[in-house]
Amino acid sequence: MFRYLLCCFGLVLMYPTGIDMYLVGLPQIANQLGATEAQLHIAFSVYLAGMATTMLFAGSLADRIGRKPITLFSALLFALASYFAARSQSSDLFLVARFVQGVGAGCCYVVAFAILRDALDDKRRAKVLSMVNGVTCIIPVIAPVIGHLIMLRFPWPSLFYTMAVMGLLVFGLCLFVLRETYSKASFHSQTLPRVQTESFKQGFFISRVVITTLGVTTILSYVNVSPMLIMGQMGFDRGQYSNTMAMTALVSMLASFSTPFLLNQFKEKSLILFSQTLFAAAALVFILTQLGWLGQLFNLLGFGLVCSGFAIGFGVTMSQALSPFVARAGVASSLLGIAQVCTSALYIWVMGLLEVSAINILLAILAVGALISITLMLAVPKLSEMVANEQIPESA
């Protein structure tokens, strides 16, 4: 099992690394390419667009030709796109490279979840996805620090050369360590008849898509508005802001790595409901601070509750969402990724157009998301009869 965990960790980490590592070099990139920082901030959206437009394609292909070929192609594509981003001489070429980089990262992200679905049973998968989430949570803190250290001695292209090396390392892992978890023979003889029964229209899958999507939208909204809340509203300087984000990342990591142990004591449903209760509690804290009933420093408690809620609930809910699928696990993973990326981007964009304040952007998704998610968890039970029919490869 270790080989699958190692490869999937590498595949998943390319997605957040591609977002966070280059930000520290944005002023230098803008200066050299003759663009403004505001113009290059679109590189974030372009990267996500690359992910979203290819996720479904990657999942469908992974269900047809296998997981390993897609991981090799995607990791190599990420490495090549990173190299060409480093060599860009204009902002247009840079944005094209960022789009392709997003394509590679998105494919890797989708196939990693499909591999874990193939290789692990329901209980182990929930624990592993929580651990994957814990490692992912520290990337937004570690990646900019690594980027800063690199730029102390090297120019901004070195950031993308580093990402290219990372892509090549993951390519090597997948080539020499990863074993194919998807059997064509098994597919045609056993799982092909199940395609008709593995419907994406079933209420259980849709409910888990909604819950995970609301969770991702919540955490990305928090990351997006955190500078305005922490530095603008609370009056922290940049150093204090960095320390605050580092502490919340630590909270996320601790909560994520605690989840596997909690799963030994509590049911998955209980943990998901608890995570949504933490979101609701965070909304209450923010309301009380805005009314003046609590001091502004209590916002830090709210931030911790947001991060803990996401860390505890996301991996478990993702595992439940994938559990009904054997023959179509790749496409299921794709649909989850597309819903999460597109909904998050749309929510933040619409709230920006409506000029909603930073605190209200976060409050709205916390309150509404918790209410909807708790309702769905209570109304739509887990499809245990489908999970009981899973066939896990012996190699796991």
Curated annotation (Swiss-Prot):
Major location (coarse): membrane
Sorted UniProt keywords: Cell inner membrane, Cell membrane, Membrane, Transmembrane, Transmembrane helix, Transport
Entry-linked HAMAP family: MFS_MdtL
InterPro entries reported in the protein's UniProt record: MFS, MFS_dom, MFS_Efflux_Transporters, MFS_trans_sf, Multidrug-R_MdtL
Transmembrane segments: 5-25, 42-62, 65-85, 93-113, 132-152, 158-178, 210-230, 243-263, 278-298, 299-319, 334-354, 361-381
Membrane topology, Cytoplasmic segments: 1-4, 63-64, 114-131, 179-209, 264-277, 320-333, 382-396
Listed SUPFAM superfamilies: MFS general substrate transporter
Record family assignment: Belongs to the major facilitator superfamily. DHA1 family. MdtL (TC 2.A.1.2.22) subfamily.
Protein name, entry field: Multidrug resistance protein MdtL
Entries under PROSITE patterns matching the protein: MFS (PS50850)
One Gene Ontology molecular-function label: transmembrane transporter activity
Entry GO CC: plasma membrane
Localization terms from the record: Cell inner membrane
Source organism per UniProt: Shewanella sp. (strain ANA-3)
Membrane topology recorded in Swiss-Prot or TrEMBL: Multi-pass membrane protein
Family matches, as PANTHER family: CHLORAMPHENICOL EFFLUX PUMP RV0191, PURINE EFFLUX PUMP PBUE
Topology Periplasmic: residue spans: 26-41, 86-92, 153-157, 231-242, 355-360
Statement: the UniProt record of this protein carries the keyword Membrane: yes
